[in-house]
């Protein structure tokens, strides 16, 4: 009856996805970028040619002229074992992408799946979507598309080095990571590792789209350092009205570090987005700069946030076996700026057991024109324990009738506050919503061990909208 929980986390993103653009190169041509989406799950599509990431598409109207396309690479073997050999052939530039052309030779008797590729350009982690099955006993050419505009966000004007790692998976389910291979680019400006000056590299048309709110060096009071991994600098930027956080890590350990960034708070308010649990692999003895998309300014207004004063997030460090080594937190703050989140004019619909909740109203403010209307819910947890807030079957009634909603489950720690949205499944309505005079919504609130604390029901009513009252 309920939809997948992941859809709830994307509700806010889907609501205002007006920044999406068509895939570049969709008009065809030998050098055009393929228009199909990358394969995410094992299927027959694993045999299709892989495609570039869409991460740069939202910025494609801005110029990449400040980026030098002079850098090239020589042919080199990146990995060679008794199963597969992977070689780099050349580096070319197509549209707004730097394209690394490679050849893979599957020397085994089984098909091999290559995926989860890590690419560092000038020590900066560049997202590349790639998943492809290479047939047994055959050699095949393939390409990796690296968005130039994503590199420019890091302050890269020219490629000087490429470090690349592949994940190889066999039909038996066994998988392994290759050693990190290094490619030096010819005709490139020398660059000191870790010498990042984000603001100095942006020029031309893209400067109009990027505003640097803060370039902040972390100190011991709010930085993160554990097991040889340290967060050494950060920047909060806006690109095309969308906020991003840039984080620079240094891994001084002898082993790779698996880093998970999550539980993001803006202006001390817990928010959720599609990168609520973003995972990155930081290699030994390397710097790495990563980019985490947050929200558009318009989306933040739905959270009553007009200006960002600070961003806080958790960092979890694990080993290669997913065993947790340590947890910590860090923040990006803008000195002198005060966040403007304020729900003081609202009243609590429920305030017991240390949990204060309100379903943001009034009813007439709900957007009935939206395909799946959203009901904002504000929660403050003063219970002294971590709680989960979940939906259940028939937890939502509108005008006295049960209505399906996108299922949700939220985690909220003690002394934190959160605003999320319940997405109404309009397809489950018997008739189109033209007026709402009553909303009744219930929640299951449990502790971190799964024990039920309470099951509050909250009602919003507007009798003036009822056809009985109107008559």
Question: What role is predicted for each listed range?
Answer:
Residues 65-94, 207-239, 339-368:
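Low-complexity, acidic Ser/Thr/Pro/Gly-rich terminal tails and inter-domain linkers that flank the onset
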Residues 22-61:
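Short, low-complexity, disordered segments immediately C-terminal to signal peptides
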Residues 124-190, 270-325, 401-448:
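Short, solvent-exposed, Trp/other aromatic-anchored flexible loops in extracytoplasmic proteins
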Residues 178-220, 322-361:
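Surface-exposed beta-loop interaction hotspot
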Residues 17-20:
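C-terminal motif of bacterial Sec signal peptides marking the signal peptidase cleavage site
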Residues 109-125, 254-270, 384-401:
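Short acidic, flexible loop segments centered on an aromatic residue
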Residues 95-101, 240-246, 369-376:
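Short, solvent-exposed loop/turn segments enriched in Ser/Thr/Gly
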Residues 104-108, 249-253, 379-384:
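Asparagine-centered strand-capping/turn motif at beta-strand->loop junctions
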């Amino acid at each position: 009856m309920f939809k997948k929980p992941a859809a709830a986390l994307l509700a806010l993103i889907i609501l205002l996805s007006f920044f999406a653009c068509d895939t570049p190169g969709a008009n065809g041509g030998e050098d055009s970028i393929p228009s199909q989406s990358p394969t995410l799950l094992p299927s027959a599509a694993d045999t299709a040619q892989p495609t570039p990431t869409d991460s740069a598409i939202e910025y494609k109207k801005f110029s990449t002229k400040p980026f030098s396309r002079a850098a090239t690479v020589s042919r080199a073997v990146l990995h060679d074992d008794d199963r597969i050999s992977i070689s780099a052939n050349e580096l070319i530039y197509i549209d707004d992408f730097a394209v690394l052309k490679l050849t893979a030779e599957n020397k085994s008797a089984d098909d091999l799946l290559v995926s989860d590729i890590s690419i560092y350009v000038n020590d900066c982690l560049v997202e590349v979507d790639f998943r492809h099955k290479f047939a047994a006993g055959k050699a095949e050419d393939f390409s990796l598309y690296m968005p130039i505009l994503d590199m420019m966000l890091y302050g890269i004007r020219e490629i000087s080095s490429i470090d690349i790692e592949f994940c190889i998976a066999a039909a038996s389910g066994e998988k392994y990571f290759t050693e990190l291979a290094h490619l030096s680019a010819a005709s490139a400006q020398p660059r000191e590792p870790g010498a990042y000056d984000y603001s100095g590299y942006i020029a031309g048309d893209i400067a109009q789209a990027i505003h640097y709110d803060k370039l902040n060096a972390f100190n011991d009071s709010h930085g993160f350092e554990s097991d040889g991994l340290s967060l050494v600098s950060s920047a909060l930027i806006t690109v095309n009205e969308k906020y991003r956080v840039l984080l620079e890590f240094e891994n001084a350990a002898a082993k790779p570090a698996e880093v998970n960034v999550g539980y993001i708070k803006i202006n001390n308010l817990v928010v959720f987005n599609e990168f609520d649990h973003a995972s990155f692999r930081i290699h030994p003895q390397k710097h790495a700069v990563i980019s985490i998309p947050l929200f558009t300014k318009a989306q933040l207004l739905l959270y009553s946030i007009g200006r960002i004063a600070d961003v806080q997030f958790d960092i979890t460090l694990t080993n290669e076996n997913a065993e947790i080594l340590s947890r910590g937190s860090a923040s990006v703050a803008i000195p002198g700026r005060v966040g403007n989140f304020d729900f003081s004019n609202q009243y609590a619909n429920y305030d017991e057991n240390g949990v204060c909740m309100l379903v943001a109203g009034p009813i007439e403010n709900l957007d009935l024109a939206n395909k799946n209307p959203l009901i904002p819910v504000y929660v403050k947890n003063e219970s002294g324990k971590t709680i989960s807030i979940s939906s259940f079957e028939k937890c939502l009634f509108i005008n006295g009738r049960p209505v399906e909603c996108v299922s949700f489950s939220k985690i909220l720690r003690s002394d934190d506050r959160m605003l999320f949205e319940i997405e109404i499944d309009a397809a489950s309505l018997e008739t189109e919503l033209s007026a709402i005079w009553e909303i009744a919504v219930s929640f299951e609130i449990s502790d971190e061990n799964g024990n039920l604390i309470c099951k509050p029901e909250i009602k919003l009513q507007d009798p003036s909208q009822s056809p009985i009252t109107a008559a």
